[in-house]
Amino acid sequence: MVTACFKPTVHNNFIIKDNIFLCKQAGYKTLLMEPLNRLFNKHVEGDMDMAGNSNLHMSRSGKTDEFYTQLSTIEDELRHYRKYFKGKVVFCNADDPAIGEDGYDHFGDGAGGYTSNFFRYFQLNFQQLGLKKLITTHYEANRPSYKFEIVSNDDGEQIGLPDYVRTPLEGDGDFRSPECLALLEECDIVVTNPPFSLMKEYLPLMINSGKQFLILGNMNHALFAENFVYFKENRVWLGYNNGHFWFRVPDHYEAKQTDFKIDENGQKWRRMGNICWFTNMDIEKRHQPLDLYRTYNPDDYPTYDTYDAIECGRCSEIPIDTDRIIGVPVTFLAQHCPEQFEIVGEFKHGCDSEFDLAVPIVNGKSKYMRVAIRHCNHVKTGDE
């Protein structure tokens, strides 16, 4: 059953009595998939999801990063992690299961809208994955939010239809709120697309929670001073898919010359680069070493003006026969095999943290941010 804060009323498919949603098709007990879709008045064919909460972004950071992830993007990544979900509680702490076109919840009011595709993915695959529970929360800018749960009814012998439970929150649903932190303690795995503008807070929270997680982000988030140490210590790494992803964007977004399109339905789309998945769940890809063939020579691999390390502009050209520290593009993180290379630092501003070694400059010319790596077979001398 679904707890809700609405006045008692009667509808064709369900009864709202004493603030309880009772579904007619399930003997006034459980909300089924299709009644749930009608209850939310959502367009189930819509292939989008909010990549970070727009209200939170716009009201707290002043940034415009309201994007909607395609369901196919979620499916392409999560198919590699199915073994992790059996019997687990999954928490999507930046996902609204029913968000209207104007950005506000239209739970049962007939206003139309669409649903979070992270919620949608786990709703559609709840029994296939063998989930124990799904919890979703999201931020509301000007009013209390709610949590929505799908709860397994399996008794070990017979598979039952899951219950759908909607419960008002006292607070706004911010992932840092006491209510959401308590839900984080309850869960086993977090899967979501968090607010990109708050990744300096979000990723450390996930890592220090001790929970497993799989979240969308940008590769450059790894080089934030608040986050980099966790990549260096192999407490987080990149998932399977990365690169340029298309996201649906609101109508008020301005058209751009590149990485922008409008489809046949008039929907605007933006393509974002360096998008990736961050996770602490071990995957086979992570242990596949790079196939390298280049050998070191000082002409092809110049030393930085600012630090005793060499520049390598392409991950495929990392030399195989040097013990020196090598500066490589951030895209290396998508190919990092911890048995092959250790991450020793980063070359960015030279002052962001103890691991920010120097500004990457070669022959007086600055390079883009680099990850500092070294072969794992490096033998330290007595002077090091």
List each model region and its residues.
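Class I S-adenosyl-L-methionine-dependent methyltransferase catalytic core
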Residues: 4, 9, 13, 21-23, ...
